[in-house]
C-alpha cells in the first residue's frame, strides 16, 4: 500500500494517511499464511504450570495453548501489572522523556537547505536529526515529521500524550519532532514517592487482584511515565489542550505570554514547563535546546 519510493529513499516514509491500508494488507497476509486475528479479545492471564507458560486465557473465556510472545507495544500496562503481580520475571528498562517541538516548515526548509527561499517546487519538506550528550545522558530528536501535524495520543483517561504524524505528501505548514532525554531506572530512585503517590500508594489493581509494588520496583519507570502523563493533563486544564512554552522562554525559565499558531487541533495552554517538569529532565532539555539552536543556524 505504500509508494514504491520507499524502496530507494534514504529515509523511507509511508505516510499516516496510507497506514490503514498497509496494516490491512499485513493482516490479510498473516491470515493467508495460516495465522488468526481475534478482535475485541484481550489476554487476561498467562496459563502457568510448574513455572512454565502453557498458553493464555482471554476475556472471552477462551484459552489458547502453546508458546506465547508478549508483543505489548507502548501502553499495555495491565499486562505489566499482571506479570509483576504473578511473579513473572520482568525488569525496568530505560525510557526517553521529553516534549514535541514544532516549527513552521518553511523555517526548517530554509535552515536545512541553506536557502532563504526555502525548498522550492521540487525538493521535499526538510528533515533534521539532533543527537548530543548532556550531563551524561543522551538528548536527541526522534520521529521527525516534516510537513506534519502534532496529534493527541493518550491511551487512557486523565492523560496528555502527544505524537507526530505526516501525511504521505508531507504538505502541512508545520514540521515537528520529539526532543527527549534518556532516562535510566537509577535516575528516578531519588524522585520522591510523594510525587508518585496518586499512582502507586496503596492502590488496588482489580485486574491483577493484588497490591501494587512500591516505586522502587520493576514497574518504577512505568509509574513515573504515568505520573508525567497525568501531570501534563493537570497542566493542560484537565482536558486535551496541551501545556506549551516557547523554546527560548523554556531556556530562560519564564512563562510564555503568547504562543504561536499550532497544528495541534485541541489547542495549547501556556504553561511553565521549566517549573513543573522534573529538574533532571528540564535542565538537560534546556541545555539540549541551546545546542540545537546553534546546530540549526
Map each language-model feature to its residues.
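Residues forming the flavin
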Residues: 1-194, 200-208, 213-297
Amino acid at each position: 500500500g505504500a509508494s514504491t519510493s520507499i524502496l530507494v529513499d534514504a529515509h523511507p516514509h509511508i505516510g499516516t494517511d496510507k497506514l490503514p491500508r498497509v496494516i490491512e494488507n499485513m493482516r490479510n497476509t498473516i491470515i493467508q499464511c495460516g495465522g488468526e486475528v481475534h478482535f475485541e479479545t484481550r489476554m487476561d492471564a498467562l496459563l502457568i504450570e510448574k513455572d512454565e507458560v502453557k498458553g493464555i486465557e482471554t476475556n472471552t473465556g477462551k484459552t489458547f495453548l502453546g508458546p506465547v510472545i508478549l508483543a505489548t507495544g507502548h501502553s499495555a500496562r495491565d499486562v505489566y501489572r499482571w506479570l509483576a503481580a504473578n511473579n513473572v520475571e520482568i525488569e525496568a528498562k530505560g525510557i526517553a522523556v521529553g516534549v514535541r517541538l514544532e516549527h513552521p516548515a518553511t523555517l526548517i526548509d530554509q535552515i536545512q537547505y541553506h536557502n532563504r527561499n526555502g525548498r522550492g517546487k521540487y525538493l521535499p519538506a526538510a528533515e533534521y536529526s539532533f543527537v548530543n550528550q548532556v550531563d551524561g545522558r543522551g538528548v536527541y530528536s526522534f520521529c521527525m515529521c516534516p510537513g506534519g501535524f502534532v496529534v493527541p495520543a493518550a491511551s487512557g483517561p486523565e492523560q496528555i500524550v502527544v505524537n507526530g504524524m505526516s501525511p504521505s505528501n508531507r504538505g502541512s505548514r508545520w514540521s515537528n519532532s520529539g526532543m527527549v532525554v534518556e532516562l535510566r531506572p537509577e535516575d528516578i530512585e531519588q524522585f520522591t514517592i510523594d510525587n508518585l503517590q496518586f499512582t502507586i500508594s496503596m492502590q488496588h489493581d482489580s485486574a491483577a487482584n493484588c497490591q501494587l509494588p512500591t516505586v522502587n520496583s520493576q514497574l518504577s519507570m512505568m509509574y513515573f511515565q504515568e505520573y508525567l502523563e497525568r501531570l501534563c493533563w493537570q497542566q493542560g486544564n484537565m482536558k486535551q489542550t496541551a501545556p506549551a512554552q516557547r523554546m527560548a522562554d523554556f531556556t530562560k525559565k519564564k512563562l510564555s505570554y503568547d504562543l504561536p499558531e499550532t497544528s495541534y487541533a485541541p489547542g495549547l495552554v501556556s504553561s511553565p514547563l521549566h517549573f513543573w517538569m522534573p529538574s533532571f529532565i528540564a535542565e538537560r532539555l534546556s541545555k539540549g535546546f541551546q545546542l540545537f539552536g546553534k546546530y540549526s543556524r
